[in-house]
Amino acid sequence: MTQNIRLAACALLFGTWAAAASAQGDTKRGEYLAKAGGCLGCHTEDKKDATPFAGGRALKTPFGTFFGPNITPHPQAGLGKWAEADFVRAMRHGRRPDGASYFPAFPYPSFTKIDDRDLRDLWAYLRTLAPSNRASQPHDLGFPFGWRFLVTVWKWFFFTPGPYVPAPGISDIVNRGAYLVQALGHCGECHTPRNFLGGPKRGRFLAGGKGPEGKDVPNLTPTGLKKWRDSDFQDFLVSGITADGDVPAEAMGEVIRNTTSQLTPQDLAALIAYLRSLPPLPD
């Protein structure tokens, strides 16, 4: 009887510890998720010896220039005073701690689909970063695009909050690929054409066109991938070199260096399987 009580007590203690560890988040998983989400590219200034995640990267768009903010845990310049709930609100609902909406240059229309566990682990990882006191640079937007209240109207038309729900009737690998593409990888933010309001064109998901900075981006539906073998495409997403020896434009080159080359072979295979499953759309 005593032995059974001891075993039960140990099990209870272990279960409590495991639950607490889960609640705190897995920083190792979070680091992988940060790579899958491309956080480094948007939140690190484009210059030699820039401090990672300290902000300053410029995104030039037809609406003006947006600057990625400091997301290190510095108490004044970064996210040091944020609670996990503030982070979840930003990612899931596109709102600042004070309730104001973020401009959708921050791809929360995609990040809203990240599930609760991944948000927790990603937050845990961001808390481990070295704090930087680099002040976040204000956006430089043309009239009237700097009026933040207009984002609320934009959201009514183009934003649906909520985590990704696995689609029935398709394989686990395709669902995993859909999650990587639609949520973490936010591929549609660049590869889906947009209307004059900056909203994604309905029915044209991943069909290519002009990216956020006005440059041509390719069609990722089977129409655009028909000349690629899976093995060649996977090699390209790791090495940044096509089977013909070509290299991509700098923007995609950075995505490959910081994101796709860091994915596991299983996740790369899932990503490709999902893209292959999409309906082919014309360029």
Show the residue positions of the predicted features:
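Bacterial N-terminal signal peptides that target proteins for export
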Residues: 1-9
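Bacterial N-terminal signal peptides
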Residues: 8-17
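Electrostatic cytochrome c docking/interface patches
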Residues: 19-35, 152-182
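The canonical Cys-X-X-Cys-His
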Residues: 30, 36-46, 87, 122, ...
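Electron-transfer interface patches adjacent to heme c in soluble/periplasmic c-type cytochromes
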Residues: 58-89, 109-119, 204-244, 254-268
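Membrane-embedded segments
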Residues: 94, 99-103, 107-124
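Extended, well-folded interaction surfaces typified by the phenylalanyl-tRNA synthetase beta subunit core
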Residues: 134-151
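A cross-kingdom marker for long, charged
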Residues: 249-283
